[in-house]
Amino acid sequence: MGIKIIIAGFKGKMGQAAYKMVTEDPELELVGLLDPFTDEKEVAGVPVFNAKEELAGLEAHVWVDFTTPKVAYDNTRFALEQGFCPVVGTTGFTPEQLEELITLSREKQLGGLIAPNFALGAVLLMQFAAQAAKYFPNVEIIELHHDQKKDAPSGTAIKTAELISQVRPSKQQGAADEEESIAGARGAYFDGMRIHSVRLPGLVAHQEVIFGSQGEGLTLRHDSYDRASFMTGVNLAIKEVVKRSELVYGLEHLL
């Protein structure tokens, strides 16, 4: 029997990519689609729902969520309460919300994943950045995304900064007396480092982590040119979370 999947936010670009991936994998079975704004009642024989409450009692194993930060927390909590293992690519969770969801997953003995990025290359970039920061503590992050992305900085950039801050002491970068002639010119502040967000049409998801030291520099970069790049990670996550009994934050915990 295949793993039964619900996709929330299936009308969005990531949701459409997830739909294609799930329907093309013989080990997965799509049993429900959720989108509050569609008039469709079914797609290729799969029922479509407008409200998550309509999915209560549906026989499913995994809830794949590519919605919006505004509803992702409530969706993930609902999924766990219904016995679905959540695989969530929506960003914008607070540390308190993550802790609440992890606690709930332990109570329910359900695996799950919230990941700022499902591209394996992006996960490796974050790991490489954490390694480099031990030797190059002066660092800035530039993340670049399409102009319809709602949150800034990206979840990937924040996760990268968190990993870096775990391996280097907090430090002030730049001149001690620097001044911004235009507010925000130096980017967002995170534990001594700066994060810069770019939003332009034509982009998908890109990130640079730039390290500087005496007489040398190191730049790490990852590019997602197509949303298909995320689906390898989503597929892996779906097949892994059903074996687990706790929600984790970051795809690296499933690799």
From Swiss-Prot:
Q: Which UniProt keywords apply?
A: Amino-acid biosynthesis, Cytoplasm, Diaminopimelate biosynthesis, Lysine biosynthesis, NAD, NADP, Oxidoreductase
Q: Where does NAD(+) bind?
A: G9, F10, K11, G12, K13, M14, G89, T90, T91, A115, P116, N117, F118
Q: Which domain of life is it from?
A: Bacteria
Q: Has keyword NADP?
A: yes
Among NCBIfam families, the record links this protein to:
dapB
Gene, per the UniProt record: dapB
State what this protein does: Catalyzes the conversion of 4-hydroxy-tetrahydrodipicolinate (HTPA) to tetrahydrodipicolinate.
User: What name is this protein filed under?
Assistant: 4-hydroxy-tetrahydrodipicolinate reductase
Catalytic activity reads:
(S)-2,3,4,5-tetrahydrodipicolinate + NAD(+) + H2O = (2S,4S)-4-hydroxy-2,3,4,5-tetrahydrodipicolinate + NADH + H(+); (S)-2,3,4,5-tetrahydrodipicolinate + NADP(+) + H2O = (2S,4S)-4-hydroxy-2,3,4,5-tetrahydrodipicolinate + NADPH + H(+)
User: According to its UniProt record, which residues of this chain constitute the active site?
Assistant: H145 (proton donor/acceptor), K149 (proton donor)
Q: Which EC number applies? A: 1.17.1.8
Q: Which SUPFAM superfamilies match?
A: Glyceraldehyde-3-phosphate dehydrogenase-like, C-terminal domain (SSF55347), NAD(P)-binding Rossmann-fold domains (SSF51735)
Instruction: Name its species.
Output: Streptococcus gordonii (strain Challis / ATCC 35105 / BCRC 15272 / CH1 / DL1 / V288)
Tell me, what is an example of a GO biological process annotation in this record?
Answer: diaminopimelate biosynthetic process
Indicate the family of this protein: Belongs to the DapB family.
Q: Which pathway does the record list?
A: Amino-acid biosynthesis; L-lysine biosynthesis via DAP pathway; (S)-tetrahydrodipicolinate from L-aspartate: step 4/4
- What subcellular locations does the record give? Cytoplasm
Which PROSITE patterns does UniProt cross-reference here? DAPB
Per the record, GO CC terms?
A: cytosol
InterPro entries in the record: DapB_C, DapB_N, DapB_N_CS, DHDPR_bac, NAD(P)-bd_dom_sf
Residues the record lists as binding (S)-2,3,4,5-tetrahydrodipicolinate? H146, G155, T156
Cite a single GO MF annotation.
oxidoreductase activity, acting on CH or CH2 groups, NAD or NADP as acceptor
